[in-house]
Amino acid sequence: MYRFAPSPTGDMHIGNLRAAIFNYICARQKNMDFILRIEDTDKARNIAGKEEEIKEILNLFSISWQHYYIQSENLKFHRQMALKLVSEKKAFACFCTEEELEAKKELAKKQGKAYRYDGTCEKLADIDVLECEKPFVIRLKKPTHTMKFTDFIKGELSFEPENIDSFVIMRTDKTPTYNFACAVDDMLENVTCIIRGEDHVSNTPKQEHIRASLGYNKAMTYAHLPIILNEEGVKMSKREAHSSVKWLLESGILPSAIANYLIMLGNKTPCEIFTLEEAIKWFDISKVSKAPARFDLKKLLQINREHIKMIKDDELNKILDLNKDLAQLAKFYTQETSTIKELKEKMQAIFNAKDFGEFETEYKILKELLKDIELFENYEDFKNELLNKSNLKGKKFFMPLRIILTGNIHGPELSDLYPYIKNFIHELARI
């Protein structure tokens, strides 16, 4: 069982989407169920509407799920599991205040040591715990042995007990910490493989320790994906516009192109342009590079152009939403545009009212002729017919004709454009 477990705290990051895509692909390859779990336990940071936005984005990428969970609905199970650990003396109540802990952290810092919980409350007698009325958290006792696990990308990783520490699993308000809720949910939902970003590597031994302490002995496999760098080679920030999946989509980049690019990013693929369904046939998580991958917007736009060309005409017409059969004309314009947004602007420039400036007189002459002109198969025949009937020459002929046909003073060769614009010429003459 594979899962994607985002938090509804902001726009989906391309790193999150990459994890979703990889989990989905592997689930399909293994013929296993795929889980979508919304991790909403951080109520202060949750943003209204983001849960639905996550589902909408996954649907756009043709990522479907068989099971859907809301983490906060598992709160009773989180509390039951925490109580079980306390009753078995595997976890304990900690009454240390934030101020006390902060003072100890400062002391460790001055001594040049990494702070570790010193066990102040670990050996409190039961009666002392019962009689103490101070707020408390619950800490899981640190493991007694080295924690090891194998990662499909990073190989074998190990963590010593002192580096895992006796960490908090339940807060003073009786809500679970991220690691505890995540570990318990993965256990309850029978997740068998976790693919996520490498920023979660340090969480893995804690989650393994939680499940082991609860007596869960089913093996879990992992793949921690390397970080994505920006074009300057620095870790991509969530504040950077093109790190947001929503921004990429709104910019007119197709979901299929984004998926293509993210699968290819830092990976060995048999070809450069492919669909998600094609990738399912050959994708191998172990071939993903350990090294950070650098995001290249120009490369993504190049891939997007190819995916626009691959779209079926009726589907592209729906996307353009201009109530015309413009698919072939739009695909022709991919030579100078890279996104659906740019294509729409090109199409609107062609079919909207135009400013002819100094060529207003010539425009009126051409407009009348174009309303009924014979639409020859060959551009040269069309051009010569129009030249002869208009008595216009040079710039005074070609510039207004270009504006009529393209809405711009610059653009593709009219001879190249003609086969795609021909059927619209009578209409353009009446705008």
UniProtKB/Swiss-Prot annotation:
The keyword Cytoplasm applies. Keywords: Aminoacyl-tRNA synthetase, ATP-binding, Cytoplasm, Ligase, Nucleotide-binding, Protein biosynthesis. ATP binds at residue 238. GO terms for biological process: glutamyl-tRNA aminoacylation. It is an enzyme of class 6 (ligase). GO terms for cellular component: cytosol. PROSITE patterns: AA_TRNA_LIGASE_I (PS00178). GO terms for molecular function: ATP binding; glutamate-tRNA ligase activity; tRNA binding. It catalyses: tRNA(Glu) + L-glutamate + ATP = L-glutamyl-tRNA(Glu) + AMP + diphosphate. A motif ('KMSKS' region) lies at residues 235-239. Its EC number is 6.1.1.17. InterPro entries: aa-tRNA-synth_I_cd-bd, aa-tRNA-synth_I_codon-bd_sub2, aa-tRNA-synth_I_CS, aa_tRNA-synth_I_cd-bd_sf, Glu-tRNA-ligase_bac/mito, Glu/Gln-tRNA-synth, Glu/Gln-tRNA-synth_Ib_cat-dom, GluQ/Sye. It is found in: Cytoplasm. A motif ('HIGH' region) lies at residues 6-16. Pfam families: Anticodon_2, tRNA-synt_1c. It comes from the Bacteria. Its main location: cytoplasm. Belongs to the class-I aminoacyl-tRNA synthetase family. Glutamate--tRNA ligase type 1 subfamily. Monomer. Catalyzes the attachment of glutamate to tRNA(Glu) in a two-step reaction: glutamate is first activated by ATP to form Glu-AMP and then transferred to the acceptor end of tRNA(Glu). PANTHER family: GLUTAMATE--TRNA LIGASE (PTHR43311), GLUTAMATE--TRNA LIGASE, MITOCHONDRIAL-RELATED (PTHR43311:SF2). This is Glutamate--tRNA ligase 1.
